[in-house]
């Protein structure tokens, strides 16, 4: 069920109706010819690299294709030159940017989707729901690369 509108805290019992019946959930979707909606990802799960929007979900999907028996999580950090840079965390000890880059090139994926850094960790943090905990991942990336800049 989707709500009919937003509750307005300044008007008890008042509901501001949604324009044209749409509610902005922050999801990126595809609506097929039968009207079925397929969720593709989240708006916030993009990095702006060199002026181009790169799906972090796609980066993870590429890594999953190259290393299917492992878990991966992509996050973006600010970059003074390119706007943002992509960091891929993985539990695969043999993961290399070169291997992922070769796969992307062979399969027509944008070179911008190749992470600048691949960080191997023991385990990708997850929420109670089993989904990747991107808040923790973002914090880990910021801390790790802040330390690298300071060194």
Predicted regions mapped to residue ranges:
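Conserved ATP/PPi-binding loop(s) of AMP-dependent carboxylate-activating enzymes
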Residues: 1-16, 52-54
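AMP-binding/adenylate-forming catalytic core of the ANL superfamily
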Residues: 4-5, 21, 26-113, 132, ...
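A generic alpha-helix propensity feature with a strong bias for hydrophobic helices
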Residues: 12-15, 71, 118, 128
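Short, small/polar residue-rich loop motifs at catalytic or cofactor-binding pockets
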Residues: 18, 23-25, 118-120
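Hydrophobic pocket-lining residues within nucleotide cofactor-binding pockets
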Residues: 54, 124-126, 137
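AMP-binding/adenylate-forming catalytic domain of the ANL superfamily
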Residues: 109-132, 148
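Acidic/polar alpha-helix N-cap and adjacent early helical turns
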Residues: 139-151
């Amino acid at each position: 069920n989707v709500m009919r509108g937003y509750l307005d805290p300044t008007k008890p019992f008042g509901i501001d109706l949604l324009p044209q019946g749409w509610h902005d959930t922050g999801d990126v979707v595809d609506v097929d010819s039968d009207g079925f909606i397929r969720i593709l990802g989240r708006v916030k799960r993009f990095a702006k690299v060199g002026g181009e929007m790169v799906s972090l979900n796609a980066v993870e999907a590429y890594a999953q294709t190259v290393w299917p028996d492992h878990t991966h999580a992509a996050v973006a950090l600010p970059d003074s030159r390119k706007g943002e840079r992509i960091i891929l965390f993985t539990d695969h000890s043999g993961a290399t940017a070169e291997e992922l880059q070769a796969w992307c090139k062979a399969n027509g994926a944008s070179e911008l989707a190749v992470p600048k850094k691949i960080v191997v960790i023991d385990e990708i943090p997850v929420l109670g729901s089993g989904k990747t905990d991107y808040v923790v991942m973002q914090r880990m990336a910021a801390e790790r690369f802040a330390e690298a800049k300071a060194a």
